[in-house]
Amino acid sequence: MRKIGIIGGTFDPPHNGHLLIANEVYHALGLEEVWFLPNQVPPHKQGRNITSVKSRLNMLQIAIEEEAYFSICLEELDREGPSYTYDTMVQLTEKYPDVQFHFIIGGDMVEYLPKWYNIEKLLKLVTFVGVARPGYTLHTPYDIVKVEIPEFAVSSSLLRERYMTKKTCKYLLPEKVQVYIERNGLYES
């Protein structure tokens, strides 16, 4: 069976923390690939102003282009409405029956797992991989794989805030993504 990691998110914008997490889990678990799964409308972010799918997808393609074992999974972008991980993983496990999926989540989402839609059924479809994030523990009633990674405290919301207040984002996200953001006037106040 093939082992593939999935890291879901809004990627608004994608940053070096996303890449670090994907790379560390890839090596720690001996995965064949890591798929980045951009979501249409994450249930926990409904009502928030999110950058267009086209721009988020372009930035993500730019961010991962140098790693052969990184790719983008468009499953959630092909659907309208809220993106529930359970629905996506039902589709992916039917489409790829020879794959053992490892769903990578940060410490913030580990604590939130009991509230995930159809969590009991989802646990039968994927192995959750929890990575530590500053300010969060990896405590959950569920069986998850824990992977320690170097601490890198950056988030997409921090980057959006820094762009809006005209602070530098150098070394926090890939340089080519930074160029794309600036050329397209994203995150300006």
UniProtKB/Swiss-Prot annotation:
Pfam families for this protein: CTP_transf_like (PF01467)
EC number: 2.7.7.18
SUPFAM superfamilies recorded: Nucleotidylyl transferase
Catalytic activity, as annotated: nicotinate beta-D-ribonucleotide + ATP + H(+) = deamido-NAD(+) + diphosphate
Gene Ontology MF annotations: ATP binding; nicotinate-nucleotide adenylyltransferase activity
Nucleotide-binding is among the record's keywords: yes
Alphabetical UniProt keywords: ATP-binding, NAD, Nucleotide-binding, Nucleotidyltransferase, Pyridine nucleotide biosynthesis, Transferase
Biological process according to GO: NAD biosynthetic process
Pathway: Cofactor biosynthesis; NAD(+) biosynthesis; deamido-NAD(+) from nicotinate D-ribonucleotide: step 1/1
Family classification: Belongs to the NadD family.
HAMAP family found in the cross-reference section: NaMN_adenylyltr (MF_00244)
Function: Catalyzes the reversible adenylation of nicotinate mononucleotide (NaMN) to nicotinic acid adenine dinucleotide (NaAD).
Protein name: Probable nicotinate-nucleotide adenylyltransferase
Species of the source: Bacillus mycoides (strain KBAB4)
